Every structure is written in structure tokens, then in C-alpha cells.
Amino acid sequence: MKKAALHNLGCKVNAYETEAMQHLLEEAGYEIVPFTQKADVYVINTCSVTNMADRKSRQMLHKAKKNNPDSIVVAAGCYVQTSEKEVLNDLSVDIVIGNDRKHDLVRLLEEYSLDSVNDTVDDINDGKHDFEELFIDQTKEHTRAFIKVQDGCNQFCSYCIIPYARGRVRSRRFENVIAEVERLAANGFKEVVLTGIHLSSYGVDFEEATGLLELIQAVNAVKGIERIRLGSLEPKIVTEHFASELSKLDKICPHFHLSLQSGCDATLKRMNRKYTIKEYERGCELLRKYFVHPAITTDVIVGFPGETEEEFEQTKAYLEHIHFYEMHIFKYSKRKGTRAAVMPDQIDEQIKAVRSEKLIALGHDMSKEFRKFYIGKNEEVLFEEKAVIGDKEYFVGYTKEYVKVAKKTDENLENQIVSGRISGMLTDEILLFE
């Protein structure tokens, strides 16, 4: 039996695609082994979101060939799409697969075995591509499954290469999403996370008036699924109608990641983000109107070109005002091929580091405050796995708001939803469950 190893770099969409490619290989009779072991085939699903991601992708391709010089090394994904010539000239790489050919993995391996011909990468931006159907019915996790429902992005933020790597918006057919959710439910999964490159755009490429809300409502009707989470959302999707209709669904998790990037309108304009801080705040207000204490999380970029001290302080004050559950703080890094990379007034790395530290500290304080709200309250927790915290063993899981909880027990609670009382804080990041 031939052996194959896969390695994923990047986002949750990439992770889904890697699991789908593993499924294809298993169906074709391959034995899946850890990436560190010797294999006949190595598949690296690459990332290109930053220059560092490009470098890591190259490193993993070279590592694969070093593991077994006689192996077939497959480079797939975003780095392949943005750096085609570089990848085709890389002697470590045998097969290249862009972001619309992953379903062809097994066929391309068979063809390569016959004539050793490398493949070319299609232009993902020519507007001629449909959603690439990939399927999973199992994941590495045993309780939560990520489902890719959308690909591509039409936004073209000035710092981002992803529209060039992923192409225009393409949505997965409604019936195919539901069929996959039903398969996962039949295999015991209780929670699904709907994800995409630009999830809020789901359905804009359909002739019929079907959008993300209608998809969520349909998933909510699937028997066996008890929780639905959403990937990153654009602020403008949160209208009164959207928030009101979501709140009527019994399975929706009140955990919303609204991408912000900056709390300053001038910075947002340079980023080519298509909303104002006032519009963003309105989205948060609506979520808090229709959900009790929802978890609102976000991303923030510090040190974007031209960000003055005054603009940074405005962002910091805005973050405190919105009061997020969690914030992912990124120091701006140049990405070749984007408009921001050639903008004037690039910020010194030391200044970026100081600003980042300030926001990370702020985020830590806000997260701790958010978690404290639950002390003394009864919550439902989906337990996932055992973990050693301090020197004691606990079962850990998450509330609907994605707050991590630990319970001291000898029972096997894996994939069980249990009701109980939050008695206190075990650590700054984990609540204690009775």
C-alpha cells in the first residue's frame, strides 16, 4: 500500500481542503502517515497571506523532498497560485495544483506516475471558475467540523493578496452544503462551523436570491446538529433583519467574529475597507440587542502605512468602547503585489511592536472581564477532550460563546453537551465547571 502524508498551512478553508484531499487519497487506497515519516507522496497545502507564509510554504516543500528524495511532492493552494513560476522551477516540487484543481489530486498523481509531467496552474482570476466541490465526512476533531461553503473574494483590501490567490466569489450549492452537514451529523458531529474566504458574500453569485442567512436557516433544520458557528463576517452583513432572524434559530452560537482591522476611519479608507467605524458599531449594537451577552471577536492590524500616533490612539479607544471578547492583533507586514506594500509612510518595526503589545494587553483584560460574567451562571458546554491543567486532569469544552471551560471528573464526556454551573476561574482563560 502506498503511503501519503499531508501538511496544511494557513486558514480554516485550507484546513478543510487538506482534510478533503486526505479523504480522496484514502478512497484511492493510500495509507495516511504523519508528515515526519517517510511517504511515497507528500501533499503540502500552501499559504500566501504574508511573505512569511510564502517562505514557510517553500520550507515545507523542501522538507518533504528531504524526507524522501524519491517521493512525489505535490504543491497545492495559494502560494502555488501567486508564485506559479517560482514553484514550477522548484526542483523539490513534482506536481503543482492551483485553487481549482484539488479535486483532481488522485488523477494527477496517476498521470504523473505514467509520464512525470508537471501541471500548470489555471488563472483563478479569469471569472470562469465555479465552486470546486470537495467533500468530508470525518475530521481530525471529534466534536466540531468546519465546512467550506464559499471561496474567493471581491473586496481587494489594499494589504491583501488573497483575491489574487483565490479568485472571485464562488458559492457552494445549497443542497451540497446540506448533504455534507447531514453526513457529518450521521457520523456524530454535534457542531458545524460554516466558513469561507469571504463568508458574507455567500450566494452573491447565484441567480436565485439565496444568501448566507437562508443557508444558516437550512443548516439549523438538520437533525443531529446541535450547534452552528459562523466564520469571519463583514460588519455590513449585520442588519436588523439578519440579527433578528439569527436570534430565532435555536442552534446558532452567539459567537461572532466581525473583522475590523482599525478603529480609525482614515486608516480604514487607506486599507480599502468598505465600512466606517460608525457602521461597524451599529453591527455590534444589533448583535447585543438580539443576543444576551454575545461573544464578539475581531482582528486588528497595527502599524499600517500612515498610521499616526493619533490614529493608533483612536483605534485603541474604539476597541475599549466596543469591548470585544477576544482580539487577534497583527503587526502590519508588507505583502508584495499589494497596494499597501508601496504606500508611503511605512511604520518602523519597533513602533509596531509597542503598539501591538498595548493592544494585546488591552485584549487580555477585556477577555478576562468577559469570562467573569459567567461566574455563578448555568451554561451548556460541549466537552471535547481531556487536558492536564496545572497538575490535575480535567475534561475541557466550550460554551456556545466559545468560552473555554474545564470540569474535574472521571467520566468520559467527549462529544457530550452538559448543563452545569460556572463556579469560578481556573485560570485567566479557563472557567471552572461544576
Language-model features: locations:
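Hydrophobic, well-ordered secondary-structure elements that form the walls
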Residues: 258, 299, 319, 327, ...
